[in-house]
């Protein structure tokens, strides 16, 4: 039975997280995974190269050796296993799953903050602190997004929470009430 990518990503991410925690290298391994994630994001053609049937296995193995250089034993084993099972293109998803589990473990919430204007660091910190209190997190990592279309106010979105305090939404609510 062939597994879909979502199942692969979930299983490998969970196994890696549990193994890294058991080996007491979770934070260090998390940092190492972030370096690989940067490489994958900065070199999108790497995924295409590694999944292409037109590229020889020898060429792919040379790239694998470069990728494994200076890697931890756990990372080297992961890369070898993904390559051997033809799942190397799932690496970024596996890293994302590890990140999700790590955030859950650390009680960290990632949230998009949409505002009409760019926020200074002080306002970002205040929003992060307030949002952390609301959702019961120790830490909130904010991804600021500027959207002049919301007119004013703020929209906060995390995996399990949405707060829309934008002027645009308030105007829409008033409009609906007036049209009733």
From Swiss-Prot:
InterPro entries in UniProt: ATP_synth_OSCP/delta_N_sf, ATPase_OSCP/dsu
GO MF, one annotated term: proton-transporting ATP synthase activity, rotational mechanism
Cellular compartment(s): Cell membrane
Entry keyword annotation includes Ion transport: yes
Chief location category: membrane
SUPFAM superfamilies noted in UniProt: N-terminal domain of the delta subunit of the F1F0-ATP synthase
Role this protein plays: F(1)F(0) ATP synthase produces ATP from ADP in the presence of a proton or sodium gradient. F-type ATPases consist of two structural domains, F(1) containing the extramembraneous catalytic core and F(0) containing the membrane proton channel, linked together by a central stalk and a peripheral stalk. During catalysis, ATP synthesis in the catalytic domain of F(1) is coupled via a rotary mechanism of the central stalk subunits to proton translocation. This protein is part of the stalk that links CF(0) to CF(1). It either transmits conformational changes from CF(0) to CF(1) or is implicated in proton conduction.
Name of the protein described by the UniProt record: ATP synthase subunit delta
